[in-house]
Amino acid sequence: MKIILLGAPGAGKGTQAQFIMNKFGIPQISTGDMLRGAIKAGTDLGKQAKTLMDAGQLVPDDLIISLVKERVAQADCAKGFLLDGFPRTIPQADALKTVGIQIDYVLEFDVPDEVIVERMSGRRVHQASGRTYHVVYNPPKVEGKDDVTGEDLIIRADDKPETVLDRLKVYHSTTKPLVDYYQAEAKAGNTKYFRLDGTKKVEEVSQELDTILA
């Protein structure tokens, strides 16, 4: 079961990815996590990626594809995997085909921009542990402090409203064509395509996914 999740940053893909992983026992391959790992490790790729991400720009295809190819070859991907944040462009989608990766399901999470901005600009992160909070949906017990350590929470650079808006512009201009691409693939019988309303309650979206993937 090889699955692609499509949707803007903050559309709820990460939450539903957890549900799919737990339900079906396949790993999530998140380019965001891979990139943050590379940035934390201070690799050349990480340094290049950080500069671009801080400016709200996308990381170029060749850097991402090399990360993804390496990851899907690992043993835990034998039964399938979940791609989150990749592909983002038609060349990336073509690159998946070129390296022989057949996608079974494409799941699009549809959420209006204004909802995304509210969701993302409210995120707060405990840097050392990666624990994430939200001022509206999942607030810490003490405002601005981590529940476990009491240390300060930060706003990641890519969660600031102006950066979120920049990322949404980039998303709409580069990733929206993927919707057409994969809908055409679905019509040709090469994959299955489903659009989900990402503004619904988490449990409702999970239930829909359960039905689709069962």
Curated annotation (Swiss-Prot):
It is found in: Cytoplasm. This is Adenylate kinase. It catalyses: AMP + ATP = 2 ADP. Belongs to the adenylate kinase family. One of its GO terms (biological process) is AMP salvage. Pathway: Purine metabolism; AMP biosynthesis via salvage pathway; AMP from ADP: step 1/1. GO terms for molecular function: adenylate kinase activity; ATP binding. Monomer. Residues 30-59 are annotated as: NMP. Keywords: ATP-binding, Cytoplasm, Kinase, Nucleotide biosynthesis, Nucleotide-binding, Transferase. HAMAP family: Adenylate_kinase_Adk.
